[in-house]
């Protein structure tokens, strides 16, 4: 949906998962009421395991989890991972186009990875995959939700080897932990590349502090 509101992105740096979820809910309400434009939250969480609506307990028998309303199964968030939450109006000409929106987000990450020299694609399983040492490896997990016509939750991109330790205790999205991998990129560089790709689809995004957005 076209809006006169300015698109923004927020960088919360290192931030608690539950507190960030509360921020998402607040921004979703604001987006539904057209008080803000499309908004992205960038964040790195303290170590945490979260489960989505399709979670299978057999995939996380040895860890404490936070239950969420996103799609998907269990995943891990922690240092070495850049999480992007997309608070977007998914309507096109007044019609809710969830599939188009999801394809757009997937293509942002596929193009980002291709620009870094990786052969990237979606696969039979959710997420973004690259070919590494002759094997397909998952470097980004996707889990979204839609409230009426506004998206929330998002994409977790592994950007440092440190994050892989968090997947050892679970079957992420029902898969063996060995499928998870990472790309070696600085956090700020990854944000810049995501913004560059998203602006090709949704127009200009300006950086803002969270307090400035809700004031």
UniProtKB/Swiss-Prot annotation:
Classification via Gene3D superfamilies: Bira Bifunctional Protein, Domain 2 (3.30.930.10)
Example of a GO cellular component annotation carried by this entry: cytoplasm
Recorded catalytic activity of this chain's protein: octanoyl-[ACP] + L-lysyl-[protein] = N(6)-octanoyl-L-lysyl-[protein] + holo-[ACP] + H(+)
Domain BPL/LPL catalytic: 34-215
Record-linked PROSITE patterns: BPL_LPL_CATALYTIC, LIPB
Active site: 173
Signal peptide: none
MF GO annotations: lipoyl(octanoyl) transferase activity
GO biological process terms held by the UniProt record: protein modification process
Keyword entries, A-Z: Acyltransferase, Cytoplasm, Transferase
Main location: cytoplasm
Pathway involvement of the protein, from the record: Protein modification; protein lipoylation via endogenous pathway; protein N(6)-(lipoyl)lysine from octanoyl-[acyl-carrier-protein]: step 1/2
E.C. designation(s): 2.3.1.181
Additional free-text comment from the UniProt record: In the reaction, the free carboxyl group of octanoic acid is attached via an amide linkage to the epsilon-amino group of a specific lysine residue of lipoyl domains of lipoate-dependent enzymes.
Entry function: Catalyzes the transfer of endogenously produced octanoic acid from octanoyl-acyl-carrier-protein onto the lipoyl domains of lipoate-dependent enzymes. Lipoyl-ACP can also act as a substrate although octanoyl-ACP is likely to be the physiological substrate.
Protein name, per record: Probable octanoyltransferase 1
Gene: lipB1
